[in-house]
Amino acid sequence: MTLRPAGPTPARVRLTGRGVGLAGAGTALAVGGHLVDLSAVALAGCIVLAAPLVSWLALRARPLGPRLRVRRSLQPTPAHAGQDVSVTTEVGPSRPTPWSVAASRALNLGEAVPEALRGHAVLRAAVRPTPRGTSLHYTLRPRQRGRWPVGPLATRRYDVLGLATATEQVGAAVPLTVWPSLLTGTISDTGARSGLTPMRAGANDPSDEDTSLRTYQAGDDLRRVHWASAARHGELMVRTSEGASQAPVCVILDVASLNGSGEPGSQRHVALEWTVSVAASVAVSLLDSGHPVRLVLSDGGTAQAGLRGGDGQAGARWVRSRDAQGHAVLLDLTVDAGRREPGATIAGTRDDVLSGLVGDSQLGEIVIAVTASTSRDETSPLAVVGGTASRRYAIVVPVDRTQDAVPTLLEHGWRATPLPVGGDLPAAWDRLTGGTR
C-alpha cells in the first residue's frame, strides 16, 4: 500500500438533532408569521433559524487541524504479522493554555486504522489526560504483511449550544511496515551443515582447496586472493576461513503466479502468505547460521529494484550481517511480494528475473527456491536456474491439484519436496538436505 503525504482535510460539519429541530421550528415560525402577517412571529422565527446556522458557520470557519498537535509512536516497528504493536497517540493544542488544553480534552477522538491491523474487532483505546492534553493507548495485532497507515486522528467537536457538530481528520498517518511471520524451529544446524556443503559446480569431488575458496566480491580484502586458483578458474578467487558451512545462499521467492491473489482468507491468498513466510524463515535462519544470503523476488517487486546490480548480480545484494539490520534488509524485500500495485514500476517480469539468474551462481553457492508454481509450464523457467550452483533445493507450495512442479524440478537436477500450507517446514528441510533430528 502506498502512503501519500497527508494534506489538510476539510471538516465535515452538520447539524445535530437539536439543531435540525430548532431550524425546523424557526422556519415554521418565520413562514407562518409571514402568511398571517404577524411580523413579530416572523422575526422570532428568523432569530430561531439563525441560531443553528451561526453554529454551523462557526465550526466551519475554524478548522481544528492547524490548532491541534498530534504525535504518534509505534513499538515495535517494523513488526511481524501476528505480533502485538503498542500505539501511543498524544493530542494537545499547538499553543497550550488552560482553556485550550481543557477544550482538547473534551474532543471525541478516534483512530483511522485499516482492518488488516485490527481484524473485525472494534478498536478500544485507553484515554488518559496529560498536562498538555490527552493520550490514547491501544494495541494492534497486524494480520497481514504490507505497508499500512496508522491514522490520521479522527476528531468530533460540538458548538457551545450543541446545535452543530464537526468531524475532521487531524495529523498525518504514520506508516507501519509489517513483515511476514517467521516460522519457529525452521532449520536445524545439523541439516544446514550436512546439506549445504559448498563445492565447485561441475566437480564431483571438490578439492580441499576449492571448498575453502569462493568467488571474489566487491569489498573483499585483496590479500585473501588465491592467485593460483584464479588462474585455473579464470576468475578471482578468495580464501574463506569460515569453513564449508558458510556457503553463500541464494533464496528465490517465486510467487509471481499468485500476484494479486484474491481476498484475504481465500485459498490463493493464504498460499501466498505461507509461501512468503517460508522463504523469509529460510533466508533469516541461514543468515543466522553464518551463510551470506541474497533474496531474489521472481515477480520483480519494487522493493528489489533498488538493490539490483549492486554487486554485479542479477538479484538482490548479498547480506552478511547477522544482526537486526541484516534481518531487515531481507525481510523488507518480502513485504510487497505478490502485491504489485497497478502502474507500479517493477524490476522486470518473472521471465526476466529468472533468465537473469541462469548461469549467475558463483563458486559454492547454494540455490534455494520457494515456489508456488505448480504446472510444468510455470515451473520450467525456474527449473533451469542455478545450473552452475553446487546445490539446488526447492520447496513447492501446492496451490491447486496440479502437481507437476516437483517432477519437473527433479528432472532438472533439483532436490525438491512439497510443503502444503501449515506443513512441517523443519521436516521438509531435513528431507531436502538429509539432516537428522
What are these regions (language model features)?
Residues 1-4, 17, 218, 222, ...:
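Exposed, interaction-prone extracellular/peripheral surfaces
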Residues 1-71:
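Extracellular/lumenal glycan-associated context and N-glycosylation machinery
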Residues 12-17, 30-37, 117-123, 188-199, ...:
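Short N-terminal helix-initiation segments at or just after the protein's N-terminus
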Residues 50-310:
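An amphipathic, basic-hydrophobic helix/alpha-beta surface used to engage anionic
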